[in-house]
Every structure is written in C-alpha cells, then in structure tokens.
Design a protein with these regions (language model features):
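Core catalytic alpha/beta fold that binds nucleotide/phospho-ligands
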Residues: 1-338
Length: 338
C-alpha cells in the first residue's frame, strides 16, 4: 500500500482582515480560538503580524479537523517534547486514542505555510522565506556580501559559508533575459560588491559568434542573496523537523550540498493571482561528513520573492505538493464540524 500523502497548505493573509486593528477586523473569528491562541493574536503590535498569527491558528485547526474528523472546539494543543520550546502538538480528547498526526507551521511576510501528515513515525519541518522583506542591502552596501554572510557564521559550516559567498553554479540571468552560465561568468562568481560594472563573454549558439556583455554586479549579489535564503530555509525546515531551535549545538555539522535557488514565479497583478515557480528536490543533506539518506528536502518558489522549504523523514516517497488554500472555501467550513 502506498504511504500516506503529506499535506502542504499555503494561506495568503495579505488581503485578509483589512484595516489596522485585528480586534475590529476579525472579531467574528475570535470565538473560534482558544484563550492562548487569542492572546497570541491580539498581543501583536502590527496587524500584518496579527493576521499571520490568526491564519496560523485557523490553518492548524482546519487541518486537524479535516484529517481526524474531530470537532473544532475539541481541538487542544501542547508543545512537545519541551513545553516551552517544543513543536505545537495536537492533544486528543480523553475518549480518543492517541493520534499520530504531525504538523508544522511557518509564516513570513503575510503568507502562512503548514505541512502535515497522519503517517506514523514521520517527522516534518517547514519554513517560508521572503527574499526582499528585510533591509539586507544596508549591510551589504556598506560592508559587502561576504560580511553580511559572516553574520550567520554560527548557523552554517565553513563549506556552506564559502559556497554562499563565492559560488553561482546556475550562473545569472541579465535584465534582457540573457543567461550567463557559471563557466561564462568565470571568476566574476567571486564578486561580493554591488554597484560595479562587469563584462563577460557569452558563447555563441547555433553558429553565432561569441559576444561581449556588460552588466551590473547587483545581479550577482541579488542571485547570491536569493541562494542564501535557500540555505536558510532548508536549514530552518530541517531543524524544525527535529523539534529543536536554531540554537541547536550541531547546526554547523549539518550541511546542504548541491543547492540551487528555484526559478521564481510571478507576482500577483491586477486580477491575476501569484504563480508558483520551480520546485527543487535534489538537494543533498550531510551531517558530520556523512550523507543523510532518510530525510527528503524540497524547496518551492512562489511569486518572485517567496520560497517554501519542506523536510520530511519517514516512509513518504512522493514529492510534496504545496497547495494554496482559500480561507472561506478550505478553512472556515471545518469550524462547524460536530
């Protein structure tokens, strides 16, 4: 029998609960939450953070109600194995047998992602990143990309640090759509500064002559920054799979190899929805110099700046399909389940 599928949902809260006060915008949903969940939502200073907190709470409950057929108001949570830092886990009602349901949630820049399964002996982790949300270029422009990566030296191995700073195995795409391979870039892959004018020779195709192209080093740094966030999301997803935090003492022993950034999708414009980009599933996981064979890692691009990384350990063979869900259609119907 085929192993149970893994569910992966993505909820976009950017256009939900408009205004600047979550208590007013989402008051009708507050009775659906526990006191702890409600406190987590309402203590957020910015409504964008409150939206994600509310979306996360609703998504977890909907997934459990759908997967186990339990009533919404009977769902309870606790953190395991550590009551403070552990992962939120479903606690079955007293008259229910222990459940094997497992899930993990991540949110960033308005999007909330959930991964879950009812398969026994399966561990999950998920992380979502947004490349252009933070003010990364302030440090990069002042000190260079090398110095910016060095901020995270406690999280990555020496090999990963070097790889992020000086490798662009996929090359770079210029503003006119021209793609330069890593071979054509040559030692420009070592460039870590913005605002430089670079030149390279593009190999002619189909009998066409070679041609010289000039481009800004901003494109190289942009590509490296996007790839850094791939490393970050993969590491975060793996750490969450283990139930530990990014303070885990073995972080630098965990290495990802064969890492490349998935090609982006397109951002939502006017009446169109944002689209999915490429999914990459051939990353290698290494720990203390040995290949980790029992954990599957994938990363999926969404719109131009988002990427969702998932980690799965267990008897799950198929690729994880990330599904965008709608609040009214896919989540709220489970609130009335009894």
């Amino acid at each position: 029998m085929a192993p149970p599928a893994v569910t992966c949902w993505l909820l976009d809260t950017r256009s939900l609960w408009t205004g600047d006060n979550i208590r007013e915008a989402a008051a009708d949903l507050f009775p659906l939450l526990s006191s702890d969940e409600l406190a987590s939502v309402t203590r957020k200073h910015f409504i964008k953070d409150a939206r994600m907190s509310l979306g996360s709470a609703l998504l977890k409950r909907a997934y459990i109600a759908r997967s186990l057929g339990v009533a919404w108001d009977t769902i309870r949570f606790e953190r395991r194995p550590d009551p403070v830092h552990g992962k939120p886990s479903y606690v079955p009602a007293e008259d229910k047998s222990a459940s094997t349901i497992s899930f993990n949630v991540s949110h960033q820049a308005g999007l909330v992602a959930l991964i879950g399964t009812t398969a026994d002996k399966t561990d999950l982790g998920i992380d979502i990143v947004c490349v252009n949300e933070r003010n990364d270029y302030r440090v990069i422009d002042a000190d260079g990309f090398e110095a910016w990566v060095d901020i995270y030296t406690d999280c990555f191995s020496d090999a990963e640090m070097w790889d992020m700073k000086y490798s662009l195995d996929d090359g770079v795409t210029l503003l006119d759509g021209t793609h330069l391979s890593a071979w054509e870039l040559g030692r420009h892959d070592r460039c870590t500064r913005r605002n430089l004018e670079l030149s390279a020779t593009q190999k002619g195709q189909n009998g066409q002559p070679d041609r010289s192209v000039t481009f800004s080093s901003d494109l190289l740094v942009d590509a490296k920054l996007r790839r850094f966030y791939v490393f970050w999301a993969l590491k975060e997803a793996y750490v969450k799979l283990t139930g530990e935090a990014l303070l885990a003492p073995w972080l630098r022993d965990l290495e990802f190899r064969n890492v490349r950034a998935p090609r982006p999708g397109t951002v939502a414009r006017c009446s169109t929805h944002g689209t999915w980009g490429e999914r990459v599933s051939d990353v290698e996981v290494w720990f203390k110099g040995s290949r980790v064979e029992d954990v599957r890692m994938e990363i999926q691009a969404f719109e131009e700046d988002y990427m969702v990384a998932v980690a799965v350990r267990g008897d799950v063979r198929e690729e994880v399909q990330v599904e965008k869900v709608d609040l009214a259609r896919d989540v709220l119907p489970y609130t009335n389940k009894s």
